Amino acid sequence: MAKDTALHLPLGLESVGWVLGLLTTSILYLFLSPRSQIPRPPVVNKYWWDFFQIKAKRDFDARAEDLIKLGLSKARAKNTERRFGPRLVLSDKLADAVGMDNRFDQNKGIAPVNLVELRGFESMFSAALHDSVPRPATSATSKRLVHLTQPFSEETTDFLQREWTESPDWHEIVVYPVMSRLTAQVLSRAFVGPKLCRDARWLDIATTYVSHRMTAAVAVQKWGTVLQPIVHWFLPSCRRLRAHIQRARELIQPELDRIKENPLEDETFTSLAWIHGFAQGYIYDAGLAQLRLTAVANHTTSDMVTKILIRICENPELIQPLRDEAIEAVRGGRLRVAALQKMFLMESVMKESQRLEPFFLLSMFRYATETVILPGGTAIPQGTLLTVANPSRLDPAIYPDPEKFDGYRFVRMREDPENAHLAPFTKTNPTNLNFGHGKQACPGRFIAVNQIKIALCHILLKYDVELVEECPSQLIRSGLLTVRNPGAKIRVRRRQEEVSL
């Protein structure tokens, strides 16, 4: 039986998620056509006296996961629909059907709340290439990982030498901002090349653009739809966002001019050069294109590697086995894709952390371009905005003792013929929707797994690490977001690595 639910989604920074397009959320109702024969779904956190959804917003911020579970548990019949804000929430049992059906459009699923029609929010291509670039550009980057592995390793070395230092004495670092800067520098090597990836001005943009855009979006969405095209010109956060974008354009332009002057020059791949060739003369905004790629990749990957590193520090018995695995994989040569692919324990630790600490509680945001009848009889009316919950990630029938962190869980799963297909970090399936699923699954997941493995290899082989227990590092849940305490710290000190990276 299909299960789906509905919730009022609060409007606020704490409940804004960013998935493949800097997705912001709204509490606007989406009414079905009067001619629809499908009954309008009830709402889980709706109160008859709550005319302005104030109670609904507070409920959602405080216990979004519980409300999603409640709604899914109350789905009674195959045609039942429930909706939060403008989103219909489906169970992951329908992830295969939604993910493989072309009638569910991803771009239209996020466009209504992206504010792309407002100046400063249009972090997409313009004209004929609108919406068409991020996926192929990311896929093109993924296909060149064999050639990008060593550059990624070089940037990791450069960053750690500067930021973590070569000191053999223990010293503390605040995890998230440091890992965000590391991720920005490494990924920017693939996006904008070796010069800009170490430019402090570009790295400042890469690490702050998402938060600036989120803040501006929240400010705009406090106003009615009719007023938004006017008020955004005067809101300080929106003016700051536009200035931020202009600085990015100014930094990108000299590098783009160099590419135009030497189109046949044999050089390391960058998405900046690839997109210029892909455009084939069409007018586009190179700065916005890079911000789109950088923001999406940096924000989610930084969050992921922060959580993984803290998990490792919370389970120090994993450190030496992870080191041993890395030493064995790298022995006899530098870091290469083939070596990274042998690190099954590291991948298991990464996936287990991701399973327990998803950045976003919902996935697969879609728009129904026509009425669709899903398996089991669930009817999705044309024009419905929907998303998929992921209760299977905590299903004890799939993951024994599901609330417990088990770094070896997916190592054992690889050895089980029936479940081996669930083990790889980049494999999408209904039991783990962190990268989406189906035809429009995140193409950047292959880049993320390599970048994170490279970072962990350098960190674990070159440094001793331990958690600063006096500083809070617990998970913080707010709305749909699950993040580590931003003040979480670790202690590090330089050690002599057993093999050269």
From Swiss-Prot:
CDD domains reported in the protein's UniProt record: CYP503A1-like (cd11041)
Assigned protein family: Belongs to the cytochrome P450 family.
Pathway this chain belongs to: Alkaloid biosynthesis
Cofactor: heme
Any Gene Ontology biological process: alkaloid metabolic process
Pfam annotation, one family: p450
Phylogenetic placement of the source organism: Eukaryota, Fungi, Dikarya, Ascomycota, Pezizomycotina
InterPro entries assigned to the protein according to its UniProt record, in alphabetical order: Cyt_P450, Cyt_P450_E_grp-IV, Cyt_P450_sf
Chain positions recorded as heme binding sites: C442
Keywords tagged on the record: Alkaloid metabolism, Glycoprotein, Heme, Iron, Membrane, Metal-binding, Monooxygenase, Oxidoreductase, Transmembrane, Transmembrane helix
Main location: membrane
Enzyme class: oxidoreductase
Sugar-bearing residue positions: N298
Biotech use, per record: Notoamides have been shown to exhibit antitumoral activities. Notoamides A-C show moderate cytotoxicity against HeLa and L1210 cells with IC(50) values in the range of 22-52 mg/ml, but the IC(50) value of notoamide D is greater than 100 mg/ml. Moreover, notoamide C induces G2/M-cell cycle arrest at a concentration of 6.3 mg/ml.
Recorded topology in the membrane: Single-pass membrane protein
Taxonomy, superkingdom: Eukaryota
Compartment(s): Membrane
Transmembrane residue ranges: 11-31
Protein name: Cytochrome P450 monooxygenase notH
Gene Ontology terms, MF aspect: heme binding; iron ion binding; monooxygenase activity; oxidoreductase activity, acting on paired donors, with incorporation or reduction of molecular oxygen
